[in-house]
């Protein structure tokens, strides 16, 4: 039996969110890729860009596409560069799964780190969902991401 939510929590903490983890070889020109494997399940995250980026996450079970999510994120204050990612996004994403009332496809519903506030609002369930992730610095919105995904049949 597939426990997708538990696997996603493990995988996300062992890929992009974890700054200690190295990328794997890119699968497409100029892509940045991460991969996590456990038993018969594989998680692959590939994205393009830096402060403005687009990407997708795919879960394979027994070598078959099982679940996927795509996302597009924009840093609204370009002077911050990677600062928002390092001080707010990655640490927030490491808290995936802490809120039991929200599906583990990004971070928690809300997370605060000093002057940064992360929030994620999602509708639907792990089978079919859409969400908006935002980061504020001193109450000013500096980043937004939209995502959607679900089971692949």
List each language-model region with its residue ranges.
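Cysteine-centric segments in proteins
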Residues: 1-153
């Amino acid at each position: 039996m597939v426990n997708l939510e538990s696997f996603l929590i493990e995988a996300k903490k062992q890929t992009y969110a974890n700054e200690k983890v190295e990328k794997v070889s890119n699968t497409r020109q100029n892509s940045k890729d991460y991969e996590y494997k456990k038993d018969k399940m594989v998680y692959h995250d590939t994205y393009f860009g830096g402060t403005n980026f687009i990407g997708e996450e795919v879960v394979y079970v027994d070598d078959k596409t099982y679940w996927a999510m795509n996302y597009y994120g924009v840093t609204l204050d370009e002077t911050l560069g990677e600062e928002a990612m390092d001080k707010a996004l990655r640490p927030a994403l490491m808290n995936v799964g802490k809120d039991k009332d929200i599906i583990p496809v990004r971070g928690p519903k809300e997370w605060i780190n000093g002057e940064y506030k992360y929030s994620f609002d999602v509708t639907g369930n792990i089978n079919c969902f859409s969400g908006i992730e935002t980061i504020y610095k001193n109450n000013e919105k500096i980043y937004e991401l939209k995502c959607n995904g679900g089971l692949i049949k």
